[in-house]
Amino acid sequence: MSEPRPIQVPSTDGVTVIAHDHGGIGPVVLLSHATGFHGRYWDPIVARLPQGYRYVAIDLRGHGDSIVPDGVSMNWRGMGEDVLAVVDALDAGSVRAVGHSMGGCAVIRAELERPGTIEAAWLCEPIIFPNDAGPARTTEGDSRMAETARKRREVFDSFDAVLERYGSRPPFSAVHPDALRAYVLHGFREQDDGSVILKCRRDTEAAVFEHAQTDTFDHLASVTAPVTVAGSGDGDGPATFAPGVADARPLGTFEYYGDLTHFAPLEDPDRIAAAIAAALGLD
């Protein structure tokens, strides 16, 4: 598969996001990533999707190769605005969309901000907290995930060192080799001394978790596009409220992947690509 073409896209708040354009002539399919990740981990999925479409994966603010001025908030409102900025830059009008975790919420935020933007969506455990989610419903400044992110190791001796470490322990030990390689090679940046450092720095990732959107669920009923929500066999967190997100939608469908985890798109690219193609009507 050829390398996608990176497009710099001005968004709100002085942010520049990156749209990785895989080319193709046809309707646009936009892919939106999880917190702490980037658009290029969708590469193995895109390679398995049908031809005849223009696949574009986005680096949301604070992630991948995006450019963010100092002091910009990681509020998830901005993530939805990043999606809209890419749709506008592509002159697409409306798109079919794929979203994972935070990226799923960003897709829905874009549709809520501008109805008609999303024709159909496939979302893996979108972070859209129901009102009864209890401790999982995070609020600004109060996030166990943020605390974990701030402890994350940022620097390794080399790309190979990252691949060896991540591939030998959960959760990445369950990830498909193609997806792990895409995540590492495009999620770290080489430094002058040859070491590599996370592109999404741990304080940025923590800030994203702390600003997790908490009111999106209340507006799901107004989203009229067909949305398929995928849930995994994880026993807590996003897996527990994924069915409720599907049920809150007029045209919501729920799919269950009991043998996969929250990292499902990285764990089984073949099966997930087939599910995306079916849900979005990609021939």
Regions found by a protein language model. Name each.
Residues D21-V68:
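Conserved HGGG/HGGXW glycine-rich cap/lid loop of the alpha/beta-hydrolase fold
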Residues F188-D247, Y256:
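Conserved serine/cysteine hydrolase catalytic core
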Residues I127-F156:
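A catalytic-pocket lid/entrance helix-loop region that shapes and gates access to the active site
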Residues Y257-P269, A273:
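Catalytic histidine-centered segment of alpha/beta-hydrolase-like enzymes
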Residues T12-H22:
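A short loop-to-beta-strand scaffold at the N-terminal edge of the catalytic core in hydrolase folds
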Residues P44, V56, L60-V98, M102, ...:
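Active-site loop/oxyanion-hole signature of alpha/beta-hydrolase fold enzymes
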Residues R153-H211:
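Conserved alpha/beta-hydrolase catalytic His-Asp/Glu region
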Residues S94-A136:
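Conserved hydrolase catalytic core segment
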